[in-house]
Amino acid sequence: QKQILDYPLFVYVCDGTDSEKLDWFRIINIAGEQLTDQELRNAVYAGSWVSDAKRYFSKTGCAADTLAGDYLKGASIRQEYLETAISWAASAEGKTIEAYMGQHQNDPSAVLLWNYFRSVIDWVQAIFPRKRKEMKGLPWGLLYNTHGKRTDLDPKKLEAEIQRLMGDEDVTKKSGIYEYLLTGEERKLSIRAFDRRDALAAYEKQKHKCAICGEEFEFEQMHADHITPWSKGGKT
């Protein structure tokens, strides 16, 4: 105890704007276990709001972990759950995390953030009731902000599509299925590209000739593509 009490400390008193303080915290955050970006933000925007928000999002076994641990990546005690929730809520209002925290810094409670977060998870569980490991870490809040008011999302039809796509060997990114079903963006699935073996087999089968013009080309001059697009049932 004496060694601890007698240990000399450096004390920094920071003046300036919130952004200047945040930059200064980043400069001195170089020794020991480095703080995460959200831990630094919590220091800069310390107040009643952050204290209450941490009650929901920042403790082992916290309410957010109990409700949505299967959907979130990171660790609550390193403020990653809190960062995720704030980033989603801030995005809904077209703001940065820093701007959102600055706006609410002196609010007496973070119940609005918690209610928003619960709405996100309730929506996810309503349209995708079956939990899968591929759901962990997806940008659910951003998807909710865009698609949360849609009335055309049928959970049974979505589940049937999920099962079909999970069994499709050409879909190499299974976690992208959920975003694909909501956005229609095929790139989310990372459809399996032709490898050299597949392309060479097709090249030999076609006797080195282009299937479109009928001319003969060297293999390196040819490009392999689906006869029928993947979206219409074509296979790689």
Regions found by a protein language model. Give the residues of each.
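Active-site-proximal structural scaffolding
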Residues: T17, D195, Y203, G234-K235
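Glycine-rich, flexible loop/turn motifs
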Residues: A31, S190, H223
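Short, charged surface segments at domain edges that flank catalytic/cofactor-binding sites
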Residues: E169-I212
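Solvent-exposed functional surfaces
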Residues: K2-E185
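Intrinsically disordered, low-complexity boundary segments flanking structured domains
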Residues: Q1-K2, C210-E215
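A generic structural signal for well-ordered coil/turn residues at beta-strand boundaries
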Residues: L5-P8, Q206, H223
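Histidine-centered nuclease catalytic patch
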Residues: A202, G214-T236
